[in-house]
Swiss-Prot record:
Catalyzes the attachment of alanine to tRNA(Ala) in a two-step reaction: alanine is first activated by ATP to form Ala-AMP and then transferred to the acceptor end of tRNA(Ala). Also edits incorrectly charged Ser-tRNA(Ala) and Gly-tRNA(Ala) via its editing domain. Its main location: cytoplasm. Zn(2+) binds at residues 604, 608, 708, 712. Keywords: Aminoacyl-tRNA synthetase, ATP-binding, Cytoplasm, Ligase, Metal-binding, Nucleotide-binding, Protein biosynthesis, RNA-binding, tRNA-binding, Zinc. It is an enzyme of class 6 (ligase). Gene3D superfamilies: 2.40.30.130, 3.30.54.20, 6.10.250.550, Bira Bifunctional Protein, Domain 2, Threonyl-trna Synthetase, Chain A, domain 2. It catalyses: tRNA(Ala) + L-alanine + ATP = L-alanyl-tRNA(Ala) + AMP + diphosphate. GO terms for biological process: alanyl-tRNA aminoacylation. Consists of three domains; the N-terminal catalytic domain, the editing domain and the C-terminal C-Ala domain. The editing domain removes incorrectly charged amino acids, while the C-Ala domain, along with tRNA(Ala), serves as a bridge to cooperatively bring together the editing and aminoacylation centers thus stimulating deacylation of misacylated tRNAs. It comes from the Archaea. This is Alanine--tRNA ligase. Belongs to the class-II aminoacyl-tRNA synthetase family.
Amino acid sequence: MKASEEEYKLNFFIKNDFKRKICKSCQTPFWTKDDKKEYCSDIPCTDYYFFDINIKSQPLTVKEAREKFLSFFEKRGHTRIPPKPVLARWREDLYLTIASIVDFQPHVTSGLVPPPANPLVVSQPSIRLEDIDNVGVTFGRHLTTFEMAAHHAFNYPDRYVYWKDETTAYATEFFTKELGIPEEELNFKESWWEGGGNAGPCLEVTVGGLELATLVFMQYKITDNGDYIPLKLKIVDTGYGVERIAWVTQKTPSAFHAIYGNLVYKFFDKIGVAYIDETLLKVASRFAGKIDPDNPDTIKIHRQMVSKELGIDIKNVEEELDRAAKVFQILDHTKTIMLMLADGLVPSNSGEGYLGRLVIRRALKVLRLLKSDVRLYELVKEQIGFWKEDFPQVLKNKDYILDAVELEQQRFEKILEKVPSIASTLARKSEITTEDLIQVYDSNGVPPDLLEEELKKKRVKFELPRNFYALVAKRHQTSTIKNVYDKVKLPKDLLEYITTLQPTEKLYYKDQYMRSFEGKVLGIYKNYLILDKTTFYPEGGGQLGDTGLIIDEKSSKRYEVVDTQKVNDVIIHVLKEEPSTIKVGDNVRGEINWERRYRLMRHHTVTHVILAAAKKVLGDHIWQAGAEKTPEKGRLDITHHKALTEEEVKLIENYANSVISDRRPVKPLEMNRMEAEMKYGVSIYEGGVPNSATIRLLEIKDWDIESCGGTHVSNTSEIGAVKIINVERIQDGIIRLEYVAGPALVDYIRETEAKIAEASKIIGTSPDQLPSRLRRILNEVEKKNNLIIQYRRIVETELLNSLKPYEINGNKIYIIEGLNDEEENKEILRKLTSTDNTIAISISDNRLQIATSKNMRVDKIVEELLKGGGKGGGKGTFANVILSSKKSKEEIIDIVRKSL
């Protein structure tokens, strides 16, 4: 959609003598006070010329630029609110915070809940990876991490705050009065914005070739069929670039110098590369507006311009700028890594962790291309020292950040050992596509840049896309939200049936200890029963649905409830049989299986206790990745970058049991979701993100508070005690804890005692003597194993001395029969095939082990053997085969002859 000219013809522009002009280069309309201006002052229509503008403001650091912006709007009636983390954990569809408006999506922007203040101002650290390949090349125009300073106003039908004129007036006042930019240098370029299903006209504020802010007026919803429907809630969504404000006031040769100051020179030094010539950098930066990274020709033209301007050889220009761009990339990436990890990201192969690992590996790749020996964590440590006052969480989580980065580098170095074999596999392809390179990166973690050298050795050419990492990030930057109907295990026709039914009153929230109730039947569909109210808890939040009885008191018929489910606000009782004596409108009595429910309540409550204990022991990066509560045990999956030690597990267990012994009150609360977020932070969403204006929180006094819709005990003492019974790494970056509490702990102890008694009986000892008896048995086994090794050596020597090879076409064929020791077989076959042109086969009934020397291929022999039936296969020089029928030694030799 293109907005009409009237959308931009603001009273503010008319009253303040702004003129509407059309840019001679891009043909875009813009507003300016300069009658003579012909260009929109945005790149690539002009070079960067803000260096030449007389700006009255003193040079501002990022910190000073941020504070100047926030204070300016605070003085003008805006409430300053704290930024959210760079991980968008209040969203189920997005991993990273890409803009300040994300802080308020989807619930504030949809009108479901009010904003925390109106109007408000915030400076939101943001991360966008779609430009990751362009970082450094454009001297700071593209960054992966930046601060979006923003003032927002939410205009409701019954409450107008401010709109286009006031927003434009604020921008003009801030840039001209606060920063001292001459009015005639300020330009408002007409544009259109769309994102997140919303749209509206916008104005891009440009000064001297640099876009400093975007003023978006969100006023349309985009329907599925592409129509634009006016929104009732009209939102002022602005974005001012804090780093660009610092750059325009400092007039440094690159944005990196404005952002990082002396850290730029320190990074060149630590990485071990020469600093770029200052004059070259200044000239290159001035012409950098001409660079369109998606068009490699513009990079070439830019370097030719620099070469011509300075009279320097083009090769020298390219080498200097390439080297500087790589150091700038590492500056940018290490800050992004620091912020991601400080806010709790754990590098992994999926979700947000994948994106974190992508940035880390790209930084490692660049260091490798620069042939630098510096450890990445040393550079991240420098960033922590530089930003610790701006972002206190980076200092608080310093140990985790550095440990995780070093571990990732060690893993990356192991991955690089695979480069030759991966290159060999790729070299067999007739053409290497972008999809092949992405597949290799996704599967093996090997950057294509580092495959290039190996492939060149094999004289294989391939086209490496400039935006490779952006393409990879795009595939992983969002998460698919499941439809509510896809999450439940109920028939579709039932889901249609319940759409007409009223919400079920949740008695389990009024009294979690209620065991029975009376309710009215609202719907019956086969063996599914819906009541007006219930104390049966439906499956959710990892807690199993309740079971119990529905009693028809008219007929005294009792129906077993085998499960309870929920769709939206309707609770469905799943019966073992169809309720033949019950009809809609009847009153029935429900009784839950209380012993089962109480076990679930204990396991659900102790899950919260253990999660908080894990955070205390391991760090703030711990995040719930999944949970399940059954009557028998609880299960909690947490994000963590390495295996837990025995000591860490004990500490978690000790903290949890201490909280149980403390008899801490456990209290459910209901709060406005935005109020809850502002008070407790987004960590309340560890168990999932509810879609409601009011959310239910569970507070364990002075220990934990989290959004949770489950059932819990009212005091930690009711849990009794907890024991962690299993810890395992279930996938990259995820650790699973399993535990038992209350009666389930007693069951576990009894089962363990029974196993110990059985083991003692088997080896003929008592439980208290079991450890010493086992030690004696192991010593005896070890002695016998040593004897077996000696006997194997004797057998091996005898066989090797006695075996005579068959000669076929200059090849030696050895046949071993009747040796059933598989390990010994492998060792003998290996020794026999240590010289070229040798095949060794061990036969045991219809099972064959085959080995060849390195200059031969085992697969041809296997192929010939399997022609007569059977199965098997191998790799390289070794194979296992099971023939469909036993063959004589002579028959096998004959088959081998054919294969040769």
